């Protein structure tokens, strides 16, 4: 399964890069699929197939990778527009609402997605779900001095929140902003992402949560058909 998943991710990353045009300001996402997209972009810039591209990264990880590939970068504050943002997701529901933040980068990811004229999400087929939060935890970035209070407030909303602990250091995960992350499971999943996004963000001590509501324009899905990796495009239907 791991090899098939890699094939799906590569196919969808390559398809996303085909949407990039010369002269664009790009939002460069975070995570494994976005990393493949950044590598494909770097190859096209190196070969001359694309030119005059500027990237705005959503994480330190993405910044390091883009710099290694000689992709010109600017900060979010240095640009007045982003033509296209491409990023992955941890879960995508039928309404194109997302959970992001498995890499604890969701604050910057949401800032870039909200600024972009067009936001394209790249995922493999395992990320499509009927309801959010049944299989993946909802990340909530919190101020270090408030995580216990926020945890209690989330419990009052029906959520079980646990402080995310680091894997290769002692203590909790610390975000690029110097904050902590609570991973939340809502009882029964998330039935109303828009309402929960607003409610959680109104808790004192919360910087941002990993629900991305009404931001996505297109989802590119990598999938295996007859043993070969392909890509399916899902366009959001206008209501």
Curated annotation (Swiss-Prot):
This entry carries the following GO cellular component terms, namely: cytosol
What is the E.C. number? 5.3.1.6
Q: Write out the pathway annotation from the protein's UniProt entry.
A: Carbohydrate degradation; pentose phosphate pathway; D-ribose 5-phosphate from D-ribulose 5-phosphate (non-oxidative stage): step 1/1
Q: Give the GO biological process terms.
A: D-ribose metabolic process; pentose-phosphate shunt, non-oxidative branch
Keywords on record? Isomerase
List, alphabetically, the Pfam families matched: Rib_5-P_isom_A (PF06026)
Question: Membrane: present as a keyword of the record?
Answer: no
Active-site positions, per UniProt? 109 (proton acceptor)
Catalysed reaction(s) here are: aldehydo-D-ribose 5-phosphate = D-ribulose 5-phosphate
What SMART domains does the database record attribute to this sequence? DeoRC (SM01134)
The record lists substrate as bound by 30-33, 87-90, 100-103, 127
GO MF terms here are:
ribose-5-phosphate isomerase activity
Question: Is the keyword Isomerase in the record?
Answer: yes
HAMAP family membership: Rib_5P_isom_A (MF_00170)
**Quaternary organization:** Homodimer.
Q: What does this protein do?
A: Catalyzes the reversible conversion of ribose-5-phosphate to ribulose 5-phosphate.
Q: Which family does it belong to?
A: Belongs to the ribose 5-phosphate isomerase family.
What is the name of the protein in this document?
A: Ribose-5-phosphate isomerase A
């Amino acid at each position: 399964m791991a090899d098939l998943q890699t094939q799906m991710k590569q196919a969808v990353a390559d398809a996303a890069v085909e949407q990039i045009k010369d002269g664009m300001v790009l939002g460069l996402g975070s995570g494994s699929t976005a990393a493949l997209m950044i590598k494909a972009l770097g190859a096209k810039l190196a070969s001359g197939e694309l030119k005059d591209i500027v990237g705005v990264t959503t994480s330190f990880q993405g910044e390091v990778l883009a710099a290694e590939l000689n992709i010109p970068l600017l900060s979010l504050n240095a640009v007045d527009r982003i033509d296209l943002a491409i990023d992955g997701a941890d879960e995508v529901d039928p309404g194109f609402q997302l959970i992001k933040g498995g890499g604890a980068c969701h604050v910057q990811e949401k800032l870039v997605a909200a600024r972009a004229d067009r936001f394209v999400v790249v995922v493999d087929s395992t990320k499509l779900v009927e309801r959010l939060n049944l299989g993946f935890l909802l990340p909530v970035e919190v101020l270090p001095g408030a995580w216990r209070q926020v945890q209690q407030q989330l419990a009052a909303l029906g959520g079980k929140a646990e402080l995310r602990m680091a894997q290769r250091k002692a203590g909790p995960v610390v975000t690029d902003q110097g904050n902590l992350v609570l991973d939340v499971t809502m009882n029964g999943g998330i039935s109303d992402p828009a309402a929960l996004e607003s409610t959680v963000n109104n808790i004192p001590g919360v910087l941002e949560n990993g629900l991305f509501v009404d931001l996505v324009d297109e989802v590119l899905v990598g999938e295996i058909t007859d043993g070969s990796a392909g890509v399916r495009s899902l366009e959001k239907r206008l209501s």
